[in-house]
From Swiss-Prot:
Keywords: Isomerase, Purine biosynthesis. It comes from Mycobacterium leprae (strain TN). Catalyzes the conversion of N5-carboxyaminoimidazole ribonucleotide (N5-CAIR) to 4-carboxy-5-aminoimidazole ribonucleotide (CAIR). This is N5-carboxyaminoimidazole ribonucleotide mutase. HAMAP family: PurE_classI. NCBIfam families: purE (TIGR01162). It catalyses: 5-carboxyamino-1-(5-phospho-D-ribosyl)imidazole + H(+) = 5-amino-1-(5-phospho-D-ribosyl)imidazole-4-carboxylate. Its EC number is 5.4.99.18. The keyword Iron does not apply. Belongs to the AIR carboxylase family. Class I subfamily. Substrate binds at residues 13, 16, 43.
């Protein structure tokens, strides 16, 4: 039996998938079912609004929207849904994604979009996990274990560096 998707991962173009797949991978690490769609704010606005308005009916709880250039997709989706929307600025050849970042982060009052770094789809996926984990104790426990593993990795790298440094200066 297929589980209902909990997170929608959408992008303005299929070329954005090279960035947005990092969100999908992060969500898969926590076994969160997703749906993935290409929904363009400029080329298919009716479908975009339909997607946003009906996401709740499909049991979607969070939408991650990636877009480059003018990057209107996250904000327009946020205007049409009560769900949290996480915007991912997708870097393009021109301006390295700065235009996308500014477009997504500068939302008017009343239409919030949580925005991650340029190309930060993995963090968008992890933020979606945290949002879901705020009301799911089992998922929250998985997040705590994930954070513990991150901390252990940093401690191990520090220990390696201290050993290496000691060899260099004769400690």
């Amino acid at each position: 039996m297929t589980r209902q998707p909990r997170v929608g991962v959408i992008m303005g173009s299929d070329s954005d998938w090279s960035v947005m797949q990092d969100a999908a991978h992060a969500l898969a690490e926590f076994d969160i079912p997703i749906e993935v769609r290409v929904v363009s704010a400029h080329r298919t606005p009716a479908e975009m609004f339909d997607y946003a308005r009906n996401a709740v009916d499909r049991s979607i709880a969070v939408i991650i929207a990636g877009a480059g250039g003018a990057a209107h997709l996250p904000g327009m989706v946020a205007s049409a849904t009560p769900l949290p929307v996480i915007g991912v600025p997708v870097p393009l050849a021109r301006l390295d994604g700065l235009d996308s970042l500014l477009s997504i982060v500068q939302m008017p009052a009343g239409v919030p979009v949580a925005t991650v770094s340029i190309g930060g789809a993995r963090n968008a996926g992890l933020l979606a996990v945290r949002i879901l984990g705020s009301s799911d104790l089992q998922l929250r426990a998985q997040l705590v274990a994930f954070q513990d593993r991150l901390a252990d990795t940093v401690r191990a790298k520090d220990a390696d560096l201290q050993r290496f440094r000691g060899k260099l200066i004769g400690d």
